[in-house]
Amino acid sequence: MEERENIKEIRVGIADLNTAFSPNRIITVGLGSCIGIAIYDSKNKLGGLSHIMLPDSTQFSKVTNPYKFADLAIPILIKKMEGMGANIRNMKAKIAGGASMFNFSDKNMNMDIGNRNGISVKKVLKELNVPLLSQDIGGNKGRTMIFNTLDGSVDIRTVGMGIRKI
């Protein structure tokens, strides 16, 4: 039987990030076109979760919240985890979100933020040599991401579709 009273549930808001050691859970809700990036160091039983909104900060002259952007938030999350004892060589990632929440009649790539977020997150993870183990991205439904730092598992609750483990 699992001792639930010792497990904390840490919330991550939109354009935010947080970390937790085992056996705690990190949860983010409201993943539409946004993407949740769960990074886990299995040797140190440490997890981090980032909820990004936009792919690239370079399009903006002033950045007030770096956690909004894939290109800034992911490296910040990794540095924060390293500061807590994690090693980037042990890190692996899982991602969810990146939905096309609006049905544009003009299928202009620039309007599909969800798809662009997915491309950017994968690019940043690759540049940082963090393997992407699994993903649940795309579609047109919102998601909740529940990251279990006990074993690195991630449950995705999709609107109208139940829960899926990635």
Swiss-Prot record:
Q: Name one GO biological process term.
A: chemotaxis
Q: Which GO terms describe its molecular function?
A: protein-glutamine glutaminase activity
Report which reactions are catalysed by this protein: L-glutaminyl-[protein] + H2O = L-glutamyl-[protein] + NH4(+)
Keyword set, alphabetical order: Chemotaxis, Hydrolase
Source taxon at top rank: Bacteria
Q: List the disulfide bonds.
A: none
Protein family (similarity comment)? Belongs to the CheD family.
Q: What is this protein called?
A: Probable chemoreceptor glutamine deamidase CheD
Its source organism is Clostridium acetobutylicum (strain ATCC 824 / DSM 792 / JCM 1419 / IAM 19013 / LMG 5710 / NBRC 13948 / NRRL B-527 / VKM B-1787 / 2291 / W)
| Gene for this chain | cheD
